[in-house]
């Protein structure tokens, strides 16, 4: 069964959030992730319909943000998204007989990690912000319990909470591929991206240390490092990739160390 381990050493703790102090489930979640009640905090955590939800308090019209691996867009992509023909699958080296062990060093809401896990990869998600990690943990909890996907989710997806820079070097496991998708200003104006980017940029801030991820990722991965970038972004750390896989709005920069077998 997949484990959820924690390494809370980088972001100053505790993190202030607003939450209902009379709700035992919320109290337990916040205590576990070192989130403390603050009446003036810009973000609120709620537990609604068995789901942990993040709300930006000064924009009450925005829907709450959740991690959902069971329904919605990710479920549709799992069923109809093109399987191993997808660009992300090609980027990490998925092919017949090859299902890499992947570390997603910038997990976010876990969507790309879920795609890779649904295609057979074993994925460890690394997330350093405790609020985002709490959302991921809640999404995993519900997915692990799901009758359709729970069995393989427990086998293939796990969460490691800690700084990407430090945790990548401390993960004592065999890693074929490190996948990185650092926060980058988006030009996409879709409602979903605008909503999530507003919330995430306020909560997490920019990945100012993103360039520092490449070297430890290259040291950890035995086969390759894959960096997802907007099509207009510069190369991570100014390092030219071995190959580039382009999509409509993004590209995958692939830094190859050895052949996938």
Curated annotation (Swiss-Prot):
InterPro entries: 16SrRNA_methylTrfase_J, SAM-dependent_MTases_sf. It catalyses: guanosine(1516) in 16S rRNA + S-adenosyl-L-methionine = N(2)-methylguanosine(1516) in 16S rRNA + S-adenosyl-L-homocysteine + H(+). Specifically methylates the guanosine in position 1516 of 16S rRNA. One of its GO terms (molecular function) is rRNA (guanine-N2-)-methyltransferase activity. The keyword Coiled coil does not apply. The gene is rsmJ. It comes from the Bacteria. SUPFAM superfamilies: S-adenosyl-L-methionine-dependent methyltransferases (SSF53335). Its main location: cytoplasm. S-adenosyl-L-methionine binds at residues 111-112, 127-128, 163-164, 181. CDD domains: AdoMet_MTases. Keywords: Cytoplasm, Methyltransferase, rRNA processing, S-adenosyl-L-methionine, Transferase. Belongs to the methyltransferase superfamily. RsmJ family. Its EC number is 2.1.1.242. It is found in: Cytoplasm. HAMAP family: 16SrRNA_methyltr_J (MF_01523). This is Ribosomal RNA small subunit methyltransferase J. One of its GO terms (cellular component) is cytoplasm. The lineage of its organism: Bacteria, Pseudomonadati, Pseudomonadota, Gammaproteobacteria, Alteromonadales.
